[in-house]
Amino acid sequence: MRLNIAILIMIAFIILLAFSLNSPKMDQIKIGAASEKTDELFSSLIKEKEPGAAVLVVLEDQIVFKKGYGVTDLRTFNPIDSRTNFRLASLTKQFTAAAIMLLVREGKIKYETRLTEIFPDFPAYGQKITIRHLLQHTSGLPDYEDLMPPYDGQRPVEEVQIKDRDVLALLKQTSSLRFEPGTRWAYSNSGYVLLGLIVEKMAGQPFDEFLRKCLFLPLGMGSTLAYIRGKNEVPQRAYGHRKRNGKWEESDQSPTSATLGDGGVYSNLEDLAKWARALRYQTFLKKEEWDLLLTPVVVDGPGPVEPDGTPAAYGFGWFVNPWRGHARMWHYGETSGFRTAIQCFLDRQLTVIVLANRTDLEARSLSLQIASLYLD
């Protein structure tokens, strides 16, 4: 049954993409109206001197909307703009997956390489887990957040933050999996932390440096980086916030904010527009790699779901289920003080990105609200 569903999704992608070259073009009046409504939406949600968001809309290779709202923090009150860098949270996973695909292209690993081939001292169940399982969230690994001791707030959060190597150590102490690898789907931050470590080990250089040299700089994404406290600095940085008892407070770091492969990248609208262009023209990925990226995982048990439980589809680092009949690749991110989302509608050449440094803005739903203005 799940195989049939996956086949239907792939057929839908092929049919929808077949029309992409002849997709209807919006006239300037409609684009202007959609952009005006987008501006009205965010202006109504965000006051001038409070944490805010940055919003980007790219249509048919043209940036039709790009604007910042609110401020980067409550100390400097610097206004958010298109060069403000936000923690991307799980939008990072698309870059981690891309890094793995580069290593496969170079012949350094295979998608069927097993975890114990890379980490020989990993528990025996690692013999059943492949890189493909990690990419598609079908490994059965427990989430490392469930293995950590609770944070009591007695020490500064930076002193108790878990790093990627700490996650590996925790998993090595785990004697069993949540389920047999490949039999069901469960979103796994642990898997993507391990993928970052795999990149590091197989490339022979730190994960952050590999991303910068082999991915970000070649695409002109000069401000994008995997942040490591004490090693690099985030330029024009936005800090995360939450509202408590009616007042805003900085909430930028948590015990899990220092891991890289699952959520450690910072970026801005200018750089992400370049990333969207690379995706649009497939300048970074070869056709066979692109096809793999968009191929939905097939499992016998429970399959991919959206945060609200809606059935979904997942490829390599991206959700790939259509929306309102449009071929789509997308992801969302949630971490301490930040909410992020990217929506790419492949048949309409439309990309929507929302980056927020406050937790009360649901970037995923807002990005779809924006998309509907340009798709309708």
Describe the residue ranges of each PLM region.
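Catalytic loop of the DD-peptidase/beta-lactamase superfamily, centered on the K-T-G motif
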Residues: 2-7, 11-67, 200-213, 217, ...
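Active-site-proximal loop and beta-strand segments within enzyme catalytic domains
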Residues: 51, 74-188, 205, 242-252
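Alpha-helical scaffold elements that line and support the substrate/ligand-binding pocket
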Residues: 55-62, 87-110, 114, 134, ...
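Solvent-exposed coil/turn segments that connect beta secondary-structure elements
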Residues: 60-62, 72-74, 139-140, 359
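Secretory-pathway/luminal and periplasmic proteins that interact with or process carbohydrate-rich
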Residues: 64, 122-130, 140-147, 179, ...
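Catalytic-site signature segments of enzymes, centered on catalytic residues
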Residues: 68, 145-149, 154-233, 257-273, ...
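Charged/polar, low-hydrophobicity segments characteristic of intrinsically disordered regions
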Residues: 129-137, 224-239, 303-316
